[in-house]
Amino acid sequence: TIMSIGTSLSAQLYINEIMVQPPSSSTSPKQDNEELIEIRGAAGATIADNTYLIQVEGDSSDPGDMESGGSQGGIIDLSGKVLGSNGTLVILTTGHPYTVSSETTVLLDVTDGNLEDPSNNFFLINTNGNSVEDDGGSTGNPTSRSAPHSNHDLDENNDGIIDAKFTDAWTFMDGISILKDSSTMYAYAEVIFARTTSGKTIKKSTTATLVDTSNQQFRYFARIGNSTGYKAGEVADADWVGGTINSS
């Protein structure tokens, strides 16, 4: 397994709920402020230093590449943020349409409301202060970095498994892979929702749960209750559920 669980329950975080790139139509354009990511942990806990939410490419053009930081939200530093009294923190954009519980911490405008389209992997990680060399990016000069960076390629040999130099140094607490319908796709998390698997090559861990959503592009995903595992699909003890979002 590529998932490395945190050293203590109090430090463990989970991606509890996520909605990426709501669909649009000619009469109902996509609203950037409708995207959301909810994180779950211990009630009132302060998130440890070196904790990040990251996006990792899952398409065949740049598999394993870390998405850019900044307003796009590809790399979000969660260090020092405090979870609400119900143990949750939600990432939203100003003008969002949601009513949020007063017991939930709200983190606004750390993305531009334009999370990557469904062909990405989302992870909660802690770097433990450990540096990992990047691929040098456009300069070709590798740099050792203790924080995730867009020059980091988590899968340099493109085999669908996060390279050991990252899993040995960093803790991957939780993750989800969301795939569309490219001919070759890369899924690095232990739960994968794919629009279709028919005629596709999906490079992944052999232990991962793969859900084929029957040619429907799921955009909303959530953990069931206080689940901590990676079962999904039509099973009685599922940990994850997903669904489509109407465009109007």
Residue map of PLM features:
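Broad, structure-driven detector of short, well-ordered beta-strand segments within folded domains
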Residues: 221-223
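Sec-dependent, cleavable N-terminal signal peptides
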Residues: 1-12
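A recurrent domain-boundary module in secreted/ectodomain proteins
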Residues: 225-248
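Activation on beta-sandwich/Ig-like modules and their edge loops
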Residues: 10-198
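Extended, solvent-exposed regions of the mature portions of secreted/cell-surface glycoproteins
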Residues: 185-219, 228-229, 242
